[in-house]
């Protein structure tokens, strides 16, 4: 994997530096969340089995291996050519951060589950409220998709594909597509 990932969240030292540089204070709750996320451990096999149970699908092997080794993060190159446009990839979600965190796979599944096709799971945040999705069921297991929230269905989106674009057939190819 040529793309490197920066750990999600911030250390206390990083928060202190950010506060000095920006001359603004983090709210106590945000500070606590960022520190908890920063210190989230890599998942165990049992934790990933539990995640699979919660999402109702087996994780594609390549994604499971990514979580075991990296567990989400901010990619070193965060731009992606998709179709005729360049898109932003903010970060990939984590499986072991507090469930209430915006960086949590399960938090995002709970929020968005009915807004994209049921074969997909959300694995990352993209620019402007869009998502990076991964196929966990069907004939394109392991495929990476870009979900555009601005074009979503006005009713149940669990079978709606008009705002979902396949960007890569595999996670490793998706990582190779990311650039500065």
Regions from the PLM with identified roles:
Residues 83-85, 146, 156-158:
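Short, intrinsically disordered/low-complexity patches at protein termini
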Residues 132-138:
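Low-complexity, glycine/alanine/valine/leucine- and proline-rich hydrophobic stretches
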Residues 63-66, 145-146, 174-175:
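Aromatic side chains
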Residues 1-131, 179:
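A surface-exposed partner-binding patch
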Residues 150-173:
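Compact, glycine/acidic-enriched structural inserts
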């Amino acid at each position: 994997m040529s793309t490197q990932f920066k750990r999600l969240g911030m250390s206390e030292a990083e928060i202190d530096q950010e506060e000095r540089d920006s001359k603004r204070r983090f709210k106590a709750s945000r500070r606590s969340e960022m520190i908890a996320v920063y210190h989230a451990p890599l998942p165990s096999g049992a934790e990933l089995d539990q995640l699979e149970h919660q999402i109702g699908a087996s994780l594609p092997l390549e994604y499971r291996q990514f979580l075991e080794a990296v567990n989400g993060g901010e990619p070193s190159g965060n731009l992606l050519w998709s179709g005729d446009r360049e898109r932003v990839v903010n970060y990939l979600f984590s499986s072991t951060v507090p469930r209430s965190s915006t960086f949590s796979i399960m938090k995002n599944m709970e929020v968005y589950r009915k807004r994209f096709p049921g074969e997909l799971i959300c694995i990352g945040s993209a620019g402007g409220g869009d998502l990076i999705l991964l196929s966990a069921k069907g004939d394109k297991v392991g495929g990476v998709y870009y979900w555009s929230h601005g074009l979503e269905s006005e009713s149940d989106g669990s079978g709606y594909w008009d705002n979902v674009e396949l960007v890569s057939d595999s996670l490793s190819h998706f990582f190779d597509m990311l650039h500065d």
